[in-house]
Amino acid sequence: MFALGAGAALRFWFIHAYPETQGDPLVYGDIAKNWMLHGIYGLSSAAGIHPTLIRLPGYPLFLMLCFRLFGMEHYNAVMYTQVAFDLASCLLVAGFARKIASLRAGWAALWLAALCPFTANYTATPLTETLELFCISLALYSFATLLENPQWRWVFVLAFAFSYAALLRPDGALLAVALCPAILFYGARLWGTSLMLRMALTCGLLSIVPFVPWTLRNWHTFHVFQPLAPRYATDPGEPTFPGFNRWTRTVCVDLACTWEIYWNGNTDLLHLEDLPKRAFDSPAQHSETKQLFDDYNQSATITPEIDARFARLAKERIHDDPVRYYFALPVARLLDMWLRPRTELLWIELRWWEYSRHPAETEFAAAYAALNLAYLVAACIGLYRWPRFSGAILAFVLLRCALLATLEAPEPRYTLECFPMLFALAGVAFERRSMYLRLPV
């Protein structure tokens, strides 16, 4: 109870000090409101409400329920509801750590999860992350329980966790991709191949069922096959700017570049001074980029002609250094998502490393980065001890890293979905080594 009380206090403080409802929360809220009041899964505009598929229905469904219970657009109530889900996630992670190691590891995981400011901070903004973490935690606990006692009710709980995780975010589908085969891999040794195969297949098939009506709706409304959500969050017929995106992938490695360059594309001015030195391979390329930015800034619109010029510039840069494009920059983006100070929801400068401009914020960000690193190191120690189901945990993390390496615009929140596993493994690190039983894969 002390851990949960401390965790609740931390989350309430974030809601009081750093609430955030601008941007994506309002997009989700608009969809939920139109869905509830008008029966249209869509966004509002000057011309009325138009259907959309840029967001999956999992989080708007949650907001609809909150709006019905607590009042329309009562986002504070949404945040406090998310606190309850996040604390439940802490308990589920603790239960999972106890199952893969010991009671001591479970207690350690509970405290680590409850007092983690990185996950707690996301309860203060109406976004998918808190519910996604809950689904992952529920899946981990149900997975371990199913392999201890293979009852069909845990198959149904797992299927719910898999499907709702994917209904919240398309990358949530990785949970089923990692754990469904693991049911067979681990369970066949204990309970026989036949039963575990039936359970794994049933779980996988049930987790797909909610996407049937969503896919049919998208086909009926937009005449496209879209079982998840589009990569670039665009409705059919809207431009995706492949040239600009490809050029961005030759430049961006951190959140500052994502914010100042990628998100400003087609919405705001682009400033050459915001680009890092790696954006130019030669003085001629610097001049070419400057001219391209100047032409774009005349209207702040990526026209087909502007996009084609970005594509040519990207092709030139890839030809100059293919290793940088295909290996070095993806690895750098991945490292930034894991190691960057997780201050994206705090009122901290994006360029946190510029000490002369804001020394106090730089020092705070460095401390935040050190805390993040401590969690990662503890998790690595726990993984080294190789508790039960470590293979499944590692498979999920590696699958997620492989997916994130394909992104052109890194954000630290994309690695947050690995934190339930990190909490459990870090809990194992606090186990007494003399008491720890090193278990097989």
What are these model-derived regions, one by one?
Residues 57, 61, 69-91, 110, ...:
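Loop-to-helix entry region of an early transmembrane alpha helix in multi-pass inner-membrane enzymes
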Residues 76-77, 299-300, 308-312, 316-394:
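Membrane-interface anchor segments at the N-terminal boundary of transmembrane helices
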Residues 23-26, 54, 77-85, 108-143, ...:
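Multi-pass, polyprenyl lipid-linked donor-dependent membrane glycosyltransferases
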Residues 227-343:
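Membrane-proximal stem/loop segments at transmembrane-domain junctions that anchor or position
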Residues 80-101, 138, 142, 377-381:
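Transmembrane-helix motifs of polytopic, lipid-linked glycan transferases
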Residues 103, 139-155, 184-190, 430-433:
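Membrane-interface transmembrane helices that cradle and orient dolichyl/undecaprenyl
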Residues 2, 77, 90-115, 133-134, ...:
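Transmembrane-helix signature of polytopic, membrane-embedded enzymes
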Residues 9-14, 26-51, 58-61, 65-66:
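Extracytosolic helix-loop segments that constitute the early lumenal/periplasmic catalytic or substrate-binding loops
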